[in-house]
């Protein structure tokens, strides 16, 4: 297991984004934490389709609200992702048992929450003219930075070809 909680997606309102986030979590062995209200139902067809056939690999936990999330994940280290963050996501060290929190696609996390955690509010670099990145892309970028720092534990680090073997390259020269 990668950690007790890597990605917390708070109040995600687009079912396709959550499906894509779920697929990223499933493919990386990362637990997905969803905080209500979500704006969709977990059994939504679009949500299931976006996650494709990865649902059996997904470890998912639901929380009634943000207070419920913090109460049940005490002892973890929280990182808050926002376009308003002052620290880059790649400039921090991610400990075991960390949670990456993302807000609504349209509004982000509440500013009051960010003000309580200024040193742990992180930003993905982008040009000034861009409002934000897509939520599921942001989650993937952040999750893979954590996994890179952890040297991709339990993940397959080498792919195999379908019709050839990489070792065949040595025989061709």
Specify the residue positions occupied by each region the protein language model found:
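Active-site loops and adjacent core secondary-structure elements that bind or stabilize anionic groups
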Residues: 11-12
């Amino acid at each position: 297991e990668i950690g007790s909680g890597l990605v917390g997606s708070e109040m995600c309102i687009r079912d396709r984004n959550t499906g894509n986030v779920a697929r990223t979590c499933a493919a990386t062995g990362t637990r997905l934490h969803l905080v209500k209200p979500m704006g969709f139902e977990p059994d939504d067809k679009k949500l299931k389709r976006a996650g494709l056939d990865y649902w059996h690999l997904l470890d998912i936990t639901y929380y009634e609200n943000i207070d419920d999330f913090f109460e049940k994940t005490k002892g973890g280290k929280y990182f808050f992702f926002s376009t308003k963050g002052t620290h880059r996501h790649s400039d921090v060290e991610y400990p075991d048992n960390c949670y990456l929190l993302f807000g609504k696609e349209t509004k982000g996390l509440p500013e009051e929450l960010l003000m309580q955690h200024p040193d742990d509010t992180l930003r993905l670099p982008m040009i000034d003219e861009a409002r934000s990145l897509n939520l599921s892309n942001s989650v993937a970028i952040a999750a893979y930075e954590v996994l890179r720092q952890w040297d991709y534990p339990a993940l397959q680090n080498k792919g195999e070809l379908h019709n050839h073997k990489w070792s065949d390259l040595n025989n061709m020269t």
